[in-house]
């Protein structure tokens, strides 16, 4: 989920103030926490441009931790804290205050100078200006205290990893969610799983759970193939310390520095793994034909049964969705399935085999164990609301509790993968730190994307939100949950209060009724609260545990419970991510923000205009649903920090701004019908106020760019796509909530489809694909109105009906029109399709449109004039208006 306004990120390194902070994977130079080695070798990361603007704030704490040497028995300090240098922070806050004063003075001036000749438009614009000021303030105040926290991975290793190769790190369950192998290409999902299995985390301490919410045998068989390939891929990653550990992304990189321990074997191993991966992809693609052929063969052998079943490789009927849907075997109506693909490994390293004819890669010095891998397809039956992604993750929560019950959980969408193998360790640093670790419900990592066009035309990276706003929230109660790449504390998801509000740790389960009637699950809750315990070996899948797993996945399990309300991920809202994070914050938990270099996780994003707008529509509609629900941040949550409440009000109410913004964007139509552009007099004073307010906003933005590590293009794209969203989808989101308030259905939200480019030449093919949809037309109208307004203004100026003062006022109005067109420029490129590869064509078309409309306006004015006629002679000449002076 993303919101308007700025964004923020934590991470990176700082060389200022003697803190010696590191960038993600590096240790800090100022010593460590309790029990750390004072003489530990420091590995400094490459300094990024933004790091010089940050200084440490925890030097006294770190010095005290080093001095006691861990003798106090407390956990170490596992992250460093930084704030923006005063040379930037003080001007940033001062500019914010000055702009606020300017907005207040502007509003007072407007109230004292009503425009009698256009009171209707004046009142609308005054209300709009007031709302713009309020929404800006709501967005800005959350960024006045940005904080960066940088994990100390070296100290974590010193404290928890043992010399014999074992580790005392806590257990971690990783959730992956997917639905459709077509709209969500399976190669993405399987790469995500491979990167999780190969992550730099104790093998016996983390497990991976794939939730297939479509119950597709394609995913099941694909996971079997992935488990086989992982036996080669994961040891290869460990032997050569490669990054990233998703093979599709790894092999796409032409070259990178070698960091492994066997350089003499690397080239041959690399070639062999590349061949194996290509064959693996062929096998995955072949499943779409192999499974139907296999099923046809079995169906012919069982023709007397009269059904066209889908068959598994072992000759049993697939209990999930069939290729030819049948009763009890179709989407929305099938049995639950759970299958352990890779068993839980032993807690002792297991070395592989030396190179041989069958396997030319030498793994004799490599631990070849693999983490536990589980396939889940929950039960679905007619008459039950399955609650989409939130419902699937709640089933994962219960099933994993019965099998591994790790105290920490991290969730991914099916198209995201682990880009930095140490990312899991980074999140654990925040969870185990002795300062706020126990009260931290989740650690949010920023979203980063592959295959986005170089100019990021549709602001997919959303850097202003992820690298500024979330960094600001990090200084309050913590960032919001954005749906993927987030590490949770299991008991926090269960609705348990944080320790600061729960002095009695023994009273974790206050009511079994809210969790359901499964005793084994309820008994697992207090066990999960022990965050430093290891994953115990899961029970054997005997009849009793299989029945418990079946009960946990049953549709009726949640009836009469608090699942989807105060337990697990929240239901009945399009943005279950934001409201789930809000539920945790309002009960007193805090969150942390972690940015690493290289990026912790990466994924795919829609680069097609229509798909991107549908994504924004779902986010904005869900935001308003939250605002008008019992989770409204305006009222809910007595434990919510006041500034955090303001941030959530902004994140949920921002689409309302589009109502007034759309009025301003369509206001230039007055050029056409009235020939004036006044909503306030004296007009020059009005424009002067606007220039001051806008200039102050841009100045604030330039300072924000510095401390957040953004680029000017990031800032421009954020402004452009906010205007595009405000014209195309935010009004639909407002309409959606109005309809729902009247008990009607509301607007349907379309899930974003992901596609795999088949060749390098088609890498950005979706960018140039025009998918016409109704939500495109409001922005097209705004473009047309502003082009017509500029053309009409030119026509009126040439016709000679304006005084010099009127032309001066008109020129100020034209600046507004041109500014609108520049902001909507990416949208205009999007609807041009492949013509947008030559952007100059757009400018030529716009200029031609200006000329045509100006000539048309001149002709209309001339024909309406009582003393002047405009007509053409056969010879091709023309009689021009007398006011032109010819």
Curated annotation (Swiss-Prot):
Matching InterPro entries, A to Z?
Cellulose_synth, Nucleotide-diphossugar_trans
Q: Where in the cell is it found?
A: Golgi apparatus membrane
Supply the Gene3D superfamilies for this chain. Answer: Spore Coat Polysaccharide Biosynthesis Protein SpsA, Chain A
Q: What are the UniProt keywords, alphabetically?
A: Cell wall biogenesis/degradation, Glycosyltransferase, Golgi apparatus, Membrane, Transferase, Transmembrane, Transmembrane helix
Q: What EC number(s) does this enzyme carry?
A: 2.4.1.-
Q: Give the residue spans that cross the bilayer.
A: 87-107, 118-138, 659-679, 683-703, 723-743, 775-795, 812-832, 840-860
A GO molecular-function term, please?
A: cellulose synthase (UDP-forming) activity
Gene Ontology biological-process entries: cell wall organization; cellulose biosynthetic process; plant-type primary cell wall biogenesis
Q: Which residues bind substrate?
A: 413, 415
Question: Got a GO cellular component term for this one?
Answer: Golgi membrane
Q: Identify which residues the record assigns to the active site.
A: 213, 577
Q: Which family does it belong to?
A: Belongs to the glycosyltransferase 2 family. Plant cellulose synthase-like F subfamily.
Q: What is this protein called?
A: Probable mixed-linked glucan synthase 8
- What organism is this sequence from? Oryza sativa subsp. japonica (Rice)
Q: Which gene encodes it?
A: CSFL8
């Amino acid at each position: 989920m993303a919101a308007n306004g700025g964004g923020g990120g934590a991470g990176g390194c700082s060389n200022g103030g003697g803190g010696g902070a590191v960038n993600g994977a590096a240790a800090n130079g100022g010593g460590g926490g309790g029990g750390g080695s004072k003489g530990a070798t420091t590995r400094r990361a490459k300094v990024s441009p933004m790091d010089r603007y940050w200084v440490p704030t925890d030097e006294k704490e770190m010095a005290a931790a080093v001095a006691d040497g861990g003798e106090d028995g407390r956990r170490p300090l596992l992250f460093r804290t930084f704030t923006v240098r005063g040379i930037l922070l003080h001007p940033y806050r001062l500019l914010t205050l000055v702009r606020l004063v300017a907005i207040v003075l502007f509003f007072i001036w407007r109230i004292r100078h009503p425009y009698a000749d256009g009171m209707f438009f004046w009142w609308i614009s005054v209300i709009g200006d007031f709302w713009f000021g309020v929404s800006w303030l709501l967005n800005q105040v959350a960024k006045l205290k940005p904080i960066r926290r940088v994990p100390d991975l070296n100290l974590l290793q010193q404290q928890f990893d043992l010399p014999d190769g074992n580790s005392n790190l806590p257990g971690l369950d990783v959730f992956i969610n997917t639905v459709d192998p077509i709209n969500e290409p399976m190669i993405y999902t399987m790469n995500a799983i491979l990167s999780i299995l190969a992550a730099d985390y104790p093998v016996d301490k983390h497990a991976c759970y794939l939730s297939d919410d479509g119950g597709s045998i394609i995913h099941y068989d694909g996971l079997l193939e992935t488990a086989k390939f992982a036996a080669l891929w994961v040891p290869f990653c460990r032997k050569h310390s490669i990054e990233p550990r998703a093979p599709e992304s790894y092999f796409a990189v032409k070259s990178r520095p070698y960091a492994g321990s066997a350089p003499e074997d690397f080239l041959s191993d690399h070639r062999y793994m590349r061949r194996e991966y290509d064959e693996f992809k062929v096998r995955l693609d072949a499943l779409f034909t192999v499974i139907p052929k296999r099923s046809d063969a079995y169906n012919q052998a069982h023709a007397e049964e009269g059904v066209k079943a889908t068959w598994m490789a072992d000759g049993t009927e697939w209990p999930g969705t069939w290729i030819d849907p049948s009763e009890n075997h179709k989407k929305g109506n099938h049995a639950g399935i759970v299958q352990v693909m890779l068993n839980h490994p032993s807690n002792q390293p297991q070395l592989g085999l030396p190179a041989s004819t069958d396997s030319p890669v030498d793994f004799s010095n490599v631990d070849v164990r693999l983490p536990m891998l589980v396939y889940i397809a929950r039960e679905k039956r007619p008459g039950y609301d399955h609650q989409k992604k939130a419902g699937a993750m709640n089933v994962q929560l219960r099933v994993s509790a019965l099998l591994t019950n790790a105290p920490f959980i991290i969730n991914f969408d099916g198209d995201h993968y682990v880009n930095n193998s140490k990312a899991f360790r980074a999140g654990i640093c925040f969870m185990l730190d002795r300062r706020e670790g126990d009260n931290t419900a989740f650690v949010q990592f920023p979203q980063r994307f592959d295959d986005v066009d170089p100019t990021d035309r549709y602001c997919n990276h959303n850097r202003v939100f992820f690298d500024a706003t979330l960094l600001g929230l990090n200084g309050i109660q913590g960032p919001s949950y954005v749906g993927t790449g987030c590490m949770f504390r299991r008991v926090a998801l269960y609705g348990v209060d944080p320790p600061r509000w729960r002095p009695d740790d023994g009273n974790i389960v206050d009511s079994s009724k809210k969790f359901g009637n499964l005793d084994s699950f309820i008994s697992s809750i207090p066990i999960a609260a022990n965050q430093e315990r290891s994953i115990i070996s899961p029970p054997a899948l005997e009849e009793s545990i299989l029945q418990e797993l079946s009960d946990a996945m049953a549709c009726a399990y949640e009836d009469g419970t608090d699942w989807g309300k105060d337990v697990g991920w929240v239901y009945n809202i399009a943005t279950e991510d934001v409201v789930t994070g809000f539920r945790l914050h309002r009960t007193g938990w805090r969150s942390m923000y972690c940015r690493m270099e290289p990026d912790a996780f990466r994924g795919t994003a829609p680069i097609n205009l229509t798909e991107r707008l549908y994504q924004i529509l779902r986010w904005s509609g869900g935001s308003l649903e939250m605002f008008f629900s019992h989770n409204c941040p305006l009222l809910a949550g007595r434990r919510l920090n006041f500034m955090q409440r303001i941030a959530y009000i902004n994140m949920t109410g921002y689409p309302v701004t589009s109502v007034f913004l759309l009025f301003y964007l369509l206001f230039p139509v007055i050029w056409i019908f009235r020939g004036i552009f006044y909503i306030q007099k004296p007009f020059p004073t009005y424009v002067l106020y606007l220039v001051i307010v806008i200039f102050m906003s841009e100045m604030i933005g330039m300072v924000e760019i510095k401390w957040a590590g953004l680029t000017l293009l990031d800032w421009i794209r954020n402004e452009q796509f906010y205007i595009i969203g405000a014209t195309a989808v935010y009004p639909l989101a407002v309409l959606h909530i109005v309809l729902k308030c009247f008990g009607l259905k509301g607007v349907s939200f379309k899930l974003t489809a992901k596609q795999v480019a088949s060749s390098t030449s088609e890498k950005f093919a979706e960018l140039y694909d025009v998918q016409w949809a109704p939500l495109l037309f409001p922005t097209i109208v705004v473009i047309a109105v502003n082009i017509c307004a500029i053309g009409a203004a030119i026509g009126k100026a040439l016709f000679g009906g304006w005084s010099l003062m009127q032309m001066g006022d008109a020129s100020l109005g034209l600046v507004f029109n041109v500014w609108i067109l520049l902001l909507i420029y990416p949208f205009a490129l999007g609807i041009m399709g492949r013509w947008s590869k030559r952007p100059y064509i757009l400018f030529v078309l716009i200029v031609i449109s200006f000329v045509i409309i100006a000539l048309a306006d001149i002709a209309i004015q001339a024909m309406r004039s009582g003393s002047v006629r405009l007509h053409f002679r056969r010879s091709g000449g023309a009689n021009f208006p007398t006011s032109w002076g010819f």
